[in-house]
């Protein structure tokens, strides 16, 4: 199915998808889980609703033939760069190419918005995930950022640091 812009009516389903891809038992069915690193939710509906009120933020979604959202990606214009975050694919569909399609759609949006670079942060000890992004042309910039945990979204089970990855479009 085509990748399109999500709308506020998608918030409940987006919240379920994103949390199932990152946290809790359901996330362990896929390879992108953070459940071993962080407790709690990845996102809540209130925060997602706020994103739709920001003109610099776009959330793309992929739907299956029944209309169910199976993948999503958060995009935020940050000057000449497009930040890619909350990249989510249903744990049951990971490894089938949907992630590559979502990244390609993000690159297309970057060009349309006049951005020349995709940028993202990844937990530094997620080596398999970093390798996946590197195979898709992303490179570590050498920059690191602290991981800020919000009590609303659980606690880190160990110290966490983020690395910045970028790719020209």
Features from the language model and the residues they span:
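A short beta-loop-alpha structural element at the N-terminal edge
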Residues: 2-16, 23-24
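Conserved GNAT-fold acetyl-CoA-binding loop/helix
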Residues: 19-48
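A short helix-loop-beta-strand connector motif used in the catalytic cores of GNAT acetyltransferases and
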Residues: 43-60, 83, 158-161
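Conserved beta-strand in the GNAT
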Residues: 61, 68-76, 83-88
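Conserved acetyl-CoA binding element of GNAT-fold acetyltransferases
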Residues: 80-91, 100, 121
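Conserved catalytic-core motifs of GNAT/GCN5-like acyltransferases
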Residues: 119-123, 130, 134-156
């Amino acid at each position: 199915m085509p990748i399109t812009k999500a709308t506020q009516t998608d918030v409940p389903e987006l919240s379920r998808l994103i949390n199932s891809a990152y946290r809790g038992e359901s996330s362990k069915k896929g390879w992108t889980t953070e459940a071993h690193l962080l407790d709690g939710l990845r996102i809540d509906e209130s925060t997602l609703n706020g994103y739709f009120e920001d003109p610099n933020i776009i959330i793309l979604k992929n739907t299956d033939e029944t209309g169910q959202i199976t993948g999503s990606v958060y995009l935020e214009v940050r000057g000449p760069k497009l930040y890619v975050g909350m990249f989510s694919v249903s744990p049951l569909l990971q490894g089938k190419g949907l992630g590559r399609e979502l990244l390609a759609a993000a690159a297309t949006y970057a060009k349309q918005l006049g951005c020349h670079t995709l940028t993202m942060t990844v937990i530094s000890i997620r080596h398999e995930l970093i390798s996946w992004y590197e195979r898709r042309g992303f490179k570590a910039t050498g920059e690191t950022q602290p991981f800020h945990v919000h009590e609303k979204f659980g606690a880190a089970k160990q110290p966490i640091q983020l690395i910045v990855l970028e790719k020209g479009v």
